[in-house]
């Protein structure tokens, strides 16, 4: 018989604490270490596990957690104790991590502690009768589940704090623990009802204060079914003005700040004081090739509550940004399309002049959003010429792909220097100063070809995906698929370091149409997604979904190993979709991310009411097109998480990024009831359509 438990997810945040009697915000206490190390004598013997981060340490003991917080010369200890609990529960580390901890203190080897194992979770079994406690950590938050087995009484769960000054429940249901120089925030307990592989959100629980003690108040729930809380909706906000706004791409820095790029036709889009361009200059009526409005770039704080900077970029014509990349200093690299003769360019760049139709642009914005480090056109006069994907290498060189026609600038010795059709894909590598092209080449055959996305590996090879209708698209002998099987097929091409030859190139498709929207590279392997209309798309045995879901198109996910040949180079390929349509949107180009372990994170849009979901934040479609957010395991055979994201109007996921603190999504919504979180930067729908930015906390099915 399957286990049935009640799980309460609670989360304490160490950041964004407020001074007593003041609205001022304290900088974060630091990032929580995403691991727990077992105590092997490196600390007090009463401690079972500990988790260290800049400015604090968490010590897990038999029935309490001790938070030791430090800022400068100030320090404070706060203890959370589970009252009346089992004094000797079984305590186990779960999900061993590859890293080990070593302590070399002093010059006596007998005092050293080495090869201490680390874990991503710590489980307390039977901390109360038939009730377990599970701790998690990510970079900025400590989370714990309280798991209540069938017929156990959740009312016996009770905890208290020592070292705090006061407790209160905020208007949004969070528990606030006042300390000497701020507050610790415990998010309100979230509940989900499990029914097989699907989870249905239930009304949230709440905290009840009884003097200095804290208990849970829970809604009615079906005691015959599993009740769980996975995962957290970290934040969700609208982003826009009174007209149209759409987020096309997103990137996240190591601290958890989200950078969003897209387009807007709103003259009142929220630009910030001191940003590069604070006023709108775009063309809302005469846009050529569908390029209207201005680019926007917005940087949000880690809580999604405040805009750090937000700027327009554009001239008197139309612009749109489709790709964004970040360097280690927080500078943002952008690409897209412009038809503005006065698009902002900087001195000494490769191409300072616009053709007057549509041009590719590449712009490097500084870390404060206040000035352009460089900005250049790329292209001379092709109809519909745009940049769709951008990537940077460790030296700051920018790699761009998109579509272009005859006359697009190429470099001597490049793979293909002439376009012999209406439009080809292209790959251009700009030097770190933006003053010249290290190489620039067309990529395609004798018919229509588009480059949609690009990634760069550590050796400087460029991985490109897109689509081709050419019967002679260039493939390599080691390709998985040498020839076009339908009207339009996706492709994956790997260019050598100087853009002169293909290291690997394959088509990918069935008898219908396919496009490649996004590519990522991890340990030399290529991961891509897009849409397919082929029931015979080449899926692999054991993949998550081996049959076409229905409708006009499904999403797909594929992993390719260019070091192998033929069928061996297709590591896995799977459909992803229900009985409706998926990913039929030309501007969903930044919709895949990959973590270091090879897990894949996806967004897009679906009309399917039976789209595959697991542990959702939203279990059912809101209507029309809804965004989806999905995580696949490294084998491509199992969902780790999947959810709808949207309201009663149409919603499109257009960009996704992953950091260990969570999954970050941007896109476009037409829903006045798109889900937002309390305290979000913009909680109300203000335009014809708005961009959205959503973070989903990283607590996925293991």
Describe each region flagged by the PLM.
Residues 7-16:
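Bacterial N-terminal signal peptides
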Residues 6, 19-242, 249-253:
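Residues that cap or anchor secondary-structure elements
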Residues 75-77, 84-86, 154, 215, ...:
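A sequence-level/structural motif corresponding to short, flexible coil/turn segments enriched
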Residues 1-5:
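Positively charged n-region of N-terminal signal peptides that target proteins for export
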